[in-house]
């Protein structure tokens, strides 16, 4: 996916060796993505031990998978009747980004899809399906890198 979206993700465009163009929209998007990562980073660091100790159970995971599956069906049916207020990725504001980031916090609960939670959140606040999916993809890159780095640091690079 990163290879496929590289031109859209990379904020620089090289015309030749001497001249490069900075894509301001891409820089702006990455700043919004960084803002959207803040809520889940804070909550993940604060509650990681609790989530692992008390919610990492088959029953919680099963309940959450069923709950979000049903919720996704309900939101999709409800959303068919609405016209999105944010149509394009470039139209996503910092406020919308932080709200989508708040929905990403739900993915800390085992059994919750990170992309599902952020897409549902984006649809609820009026983002189009396409923009919601694209923003969720961009949001995955720093989120997964950060979560992986956190776990590696926490466990001292010990692999089992």
Question: Where on the chain are the PLM-derived regions?
Answer:
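Multi-pass membrane proteins that catalyze or facilitate reactions on polyprenyl-/lipid-phosphate substrates
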Residues: 1-160
């Amino acid at each position: 996916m990163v290879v496929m979206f590289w031109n859209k993700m990379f904020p620089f465009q090289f015309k030749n060796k001497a001249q490069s163009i900075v894509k301001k929209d891409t820089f702006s998007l990455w700043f919004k993505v960084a803002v959207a990562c803040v809520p889940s980073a804070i909550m993940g660091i604060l509650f990681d031990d609790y989530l692992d100790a008390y919610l990492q159970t088959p029953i919680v995971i099963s309940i959450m998978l069923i709950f979000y599956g049903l919720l996704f069906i309900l939101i999709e049916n409800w959303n068919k009747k609405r016209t999105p207020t944010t149509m394009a990725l470039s139209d996503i504001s910092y406020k919308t980004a932080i709200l989508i980031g708040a929905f990403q916090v739900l993915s800390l609960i085992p059994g919750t899809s990170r992309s599902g939670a952020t897409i549902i959140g984006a649809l609820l606040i009026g983002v189009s399906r396409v923009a919601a999916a694209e923003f969720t993809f961009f949001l995955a890159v720093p989120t997964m890198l950060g979560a992986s780095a956190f776990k590696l640091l926490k466990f001292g690079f010990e692999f089992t």
